[in-house]
């Protein structure tokens, strides 16, 4: 694979989705490679249908293992439809969430076991990992407060979970960072949005020698 694969991770309300939209045009100026922004859950037609099922607030009866399997399923389809073709075409793929989200949210948040969810997703992804993951670091209470202020009515099924769920998610992310410090780089997500974007671009440029 000749392209570059970057994922953005973080708790709910960390601002990564907003930052991603700003990073893309600036990253495009630094690189001759086409930049593709995608997201999980979703990113392609079938995966977006699975997203709707996963995040629907009416599906409160969904079993935790079902949820984990659906996330793995949408990820597989997203890889086949979007990520692999883009990487094979020498593009830069920026994915808003990827495998670490499942390990943190289903492994720790839902208490299914981080190792079990990691194994499930290695099967789904055929071990395709990003070369770089930017982790938007923010205390869970701050992230949830942002969601309540901005879009409380539109919060999805996982965003509506209690604080202890989100604390387990954040603790799991910190554990993943320790285990894979080469791949996962922390960004201070409590800075101004512009500073967050600037930090992301600096790390990406340095890691992949862009804009020299």
Sequence positions of predicted segments:
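P-loop (Walker A) phosphate-binding loop of NTP-binding proteins
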Residues: 11
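ATP-dependent small-molecule kinase phosphotransfer cores
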Residues: 30-125, 199
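Pre-Walker A (Motif I) flank of P-loop NTPase domains
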Residues: 2-5
